[in-house]
Every structure is written in C-alpha cells, then in structure tokens.
C-alpha cells in the first residue's frame, strides 16, 4: 500500500507563476501520443470473447478458467467503450505492476484512440490522486510514526480508502468516467467497489469487473457461496482455455480438486473432442517437473537447477521467471545469479546493492560531520577519498559488500569474482577482507540496520517504483514474489516453496495456485523441505508430467 501524503498541489487552484501559456506548452510535450490501427496486432478472438468485447451491457462481471484471456478481453472491451462514448475510460487493478501489462494489452488492439483518454492505475494510487485533486487534507494522529506498519494501514483504510462519507462530502467536484473496468476484483474490498461505482461512474456508464476467486491471496474479499462478493449481480463465465494442449491446464484442474473442492467452485472447462485419443495417449505440450530438496543450501541449489535447465532444455533467459512467496530468498539468489553468470536480471524488489547504498546515504545524512570509521576506511581503500561527493564511492562499496557477503557464504565460487571487482575498484580482496575483519563490529552493526531498513516505508516505496517500471521483455531472467506477479504470465516458471510460509498460512493454497498458473507452458516446482505440501503435491504432479 502506498501511504497517503499531504501534498499541496490542488488541481483546481491556479498559480501566478504557472501561466496558461506554460501549461499549454507542458501539455503539448507531455500528452500521450495517438494510438494508430497499425500499432496493434491481428488478434484471433474466439466467438465468446467477441460477444463479450462488443457487449453493451452496462454492468457485468466476467470470470473464467485459467488461460481464458480475461485481460485480453478487458483491453479490447475498454477500447470498444471509448469508440462508443469518446469519453474517459478508467481501468483499475489491485496489483501496481499490472499497469504496464494492461497498457501493453491495450496497445495490441487494432484501433485508433488517444492514450490520454485511458487512465490505468491501482486502487490506492487512484484514490491518493483523487483526494489530492479534491484538496482533501490528510491528517495523522499523534505519535503516528510509532505505530506498526499494519496499524498505519488500518488507519488509512478506515479514514480514507474505505471512507464513503469522505467522497459523499465532495461528490459535486469529483471527475467521473464514462466506463470503468476493474481487474483482480477478488482483491477488492466491498467499500472500494461502492466508492468507485457510486462516485466515479457517470450515470448509465459501463461498469465491468474481472477476476478469479481462486486467486484471492490477500483475503480482502469475504467469499459468498464459494464466490467473490461484488456489487454486480450474476456473472459471465469463460470456459475455453487457450492453453488446453498444455500440461499446466491439467495440473491446475487437479490442484483445484485437491485444495479447493470444499472452498470454491471447480473450473468447468469446455470439453474437447477426445474421440481420436482412444487408442493413443494424449500428447500434451509443455514441461512440468517437481523437486523436493531437504538439507541443502537453497540458493546454490536453485542456481544449479536453473542453470542446468537453461543448458539442457534450451530455455531462453527472457522466458524465465522465478517466483517465491517471500523476498529474502529471492534477493539473495538474485545477487548469487548475477555475479555467478555475469548476466543481468529484472526484479520487482530492491537489490542488495541498492539497500547497501541507501543505508550508506542514510548514515551520511545522520552523521554529516563524521562517518563511522569503517566507512571512511572503505572510501580510502577504494581511493575515493578525494571525490567531490560520496555518490560513486557508496555505489562501489554497495557492490563490494554484496560480493563480500556472498564470498563469506560461498568462498569457492566467489573468491575470484570478489578479487576481480576489488581490482576494478583500485584495491584487492585481501585488503578488503582484512579491513572488514578488523572493523567487524561496525560492519555487523551496519548489517543489523540493513535488516531494519528492509522492513521500513522507504523500502516499500523503492519496491513500488521497481514494480511500476517492470516490463516482461527485458531479455533477462525475472524474479518476483507471487503476489507481485499476479496477473502476469511467463513461458517458464520456477516456483519455489520454502520450508516455512509464516504470515500467509490462511491463503497459502491460493498463493501457490496463483504461482503455478502464471506459467504459459513450462513449470518447475522446487520444494525446499516443506513436507506438508510435498505429501499433497507429489501425486497430482506425477500424473501431470
């Protein structure tokens, strides 16, 4: 969640220094371009998809089986809504990362439309912007900074994000939209739906919801009769899976039958004619594998597995995404992978180097007159003591500390790599090791502060920034939590199950289901010692290979 801030930039108030001429000039340069027909692609929609895309039913909820193309329909339906109304179209998600994904899907539609008429945001960012535009002052109670992150979120939720009265008081000045589409509706709280529909939709406007109750990983929406509780009656069901020839679809169905039979409706796929398969085994495409590893180092084992698959299965790095429910393991593996393979990665979270540099800058701000001795010695060690500022020094120290920690854990693999980077920074690995051994107390204190900063609001803002700038076709291996990758999909998924999954026990089945259904074709599940899920998963995966 992005916390509200009291920003005094009220759109309805003019400023003497910001003239109409200057505004027009800014608008001319910053306005999104026109999307042309030739910018799109020839997408082959099914008959059912075409019916929904061109439907003029003003209120609908769409739910569908795995791989039924819900987001593809949303994008095309949004463009059709613009063509009918020539008005403003609002597309909302829960996951901040889906903004780019939905933008790409809309870009694939063969139609001419102005991008400035499409607003794509997650709920919290949208409400933050609207409260700012309305000039609503955001206030916090005394000793707010002493509250836990959860307490802060509850405060903002009750006073702003779910506060209908706040919008009732400002109803006359709210800018409304001709059509509103909400993706991931299973993650929306009922008050959010009511606020969006009652205050931001023009009278008689189009209001369409998309979602899958089995991906209810945040537990924001209390299910009703095994389904999502929404403010639209009934639903349209999509039964055609466009991954029907892939093993991943069969695995998804078996997972539902094992884990969700008493909780949700099992997906009812349209049946495929199997008359030609009587004498022959079905030849499903894709690759499904499962590994259960005990008493092994998670990071080095994971690297070996992924590297071997890239070589033996000819997997392309751009097609690979590594998912887990927690960031800690992913962040450590990210550094291990980059410095072992000499390849870049694309992550939805901060790198170790980023956090090192961030903390170094924070320490400098708090100790402007005298840095801790070990940091001063590091600056001298890499011969950056005569620099105008510490920008380059802290960047290099951030890298060296990351590789140093890897070397402590995996000396055989990283000793030479550390030495190479030390030479690049005008020192040697021997000198670096000696310095950090002598200054162990100071460096240990630094590492303890790293653990604290990783739980703070600054890191949350950094992660949100990483998510906003995440794109699939980076040419590199992607790493993400399952939560952040929800809504996306990848050709090949490495899904990690850690031994413990604290704080997510209530929704871990949904989290796991969401993770495995992110795969378009290939799925490798790596279970690091979680015996309970090993007993549950092994059987259904063996029959899906």
What residues fall within each predicted segment?
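Active-site cores that bind ATP or allylic diphosphates and position pyrophosphate for catalysis
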Residues: 439
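Conserved RecA-like ASCE ATPase "motif II neighborhood" in helicase/translocase motors
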Residues: 131-179, 184, 188-198, 477-484
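N-terminal pre-P-loop "Q-motif" helix
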Residues: 18-28, 33-58, 73
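Conserved helicase motor core of SF1/SF2 NTP-dependent helicases
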Residues: 42, 47, 58-129, 179, ...
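A short, aliphatic-rich alpha-helical micro-motif
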Residues: 53-56, 174, 487
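Accessory nucleic-acid engagement/destabilization modules that flank
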Residues: 1-21
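N-terminal leader/presequence-like segments
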Residues: 6-11, 136-138, 531
